[in-house]
Amino acid sequence: MTYLAKILDEKRHEVAELRKQRPQQRYEERKNDLSSCRDFAGNLKRTGENLRLIAEIKKASPSRGVIVHDFDPVDMARRYIGLGASAFSVLTDRLFFQGSIDYLETVKLQFHLPVIRKDFIIDERQIFESRLIGADAILLIVAALEASQLRDYLQLAAEIGLAVLVEVHDRQELDTAAEAGAGIIGVNNRNLKDFSVSLDTAIDLRPHFPEGVIAVAESGLKSADDIQRIGQASFDAVLIGEGLHVSPELHNVTWQKP
């Protein structure tokens, strides 16, 4: 069984529990009191020479185990702002990434940048939950969804005010995302089946993006040369988590600030 299959199997159990919390009903009851979402897409659009940075707040991963032992999401977010981040990505998956909804809620409350919920969304209830906990955007992974689900979830997210980063790994998934109407597409350089990484994945797919779509490169970015290659390939933004911890070189990169 692949990493992704294991994660999705567990996520189905989580969704079964989430049904009991009735997030759609709670959203309907509270929607008039919820604050407007911050402009995630606007903060990602590149308008100059430098890339935008989505800085990921992540404690652990299935492939590496615990990455940050003295994990403090507030301190991490503060340091990322100092680096020039335009948005935060917060892991909320508990079992595989040791994430938490609490981390997202705390970061959203403490700082001014838009926040994307990084999780494995396979059910509309998770989308309503994301809005309730304060996310400004969600991640939808093409490999985890049917094409019809992707279209429906993009529409639902738009209706309740959430931006969506649609994640792809190959040309077929990119075409699926484009046909579904994705406005922000991220190429994950990490293969979710075996967790191998290649920066060429993003670079090779970039020419096939629809015009006007915000382009994001994710995973495997660990050096200034990596950032330069992605910038030359005309991406708008990068999403970096582990690299900001293991590569001090990335701390000296100049990012386009919000």
UniProtKB/Swiss-Prot annotation:
Superkingdom of this protein's organism: Bacteria
Q: Which Pfam families match?
A: IGPS (PF00218)
**PROSITE patterns (alphabetical):** IGPS
Q: Which GO terms describe its molecular function?
A: indole-3-glycerol-phosphate synthase activity; phosphoribosylanthranilate isomerase activity
Keywords, comma-separated and alphabetical? Amino-acid biosynthesis, Aromatic amino acid biosynthesis, Decarboxylase, Lyase, Tryptophan biosynthesis
An annotated GO BP: L-tryptophan biosynthetic process
Q: Mind telling me what this protein is named?
A: Indole-3-glycerol phosphate synthase
- What organism does the record attribute this protein to? Chlorobium limicola (strain DSM 245 / NBRC 103803 / 6330)
Classification of source organism: Bacteria, Pseudomonadati, Chlorobiota, Chlorobiia, Chlorobiales
Could you tell me the gene encoding this protein?
Answer: trpC
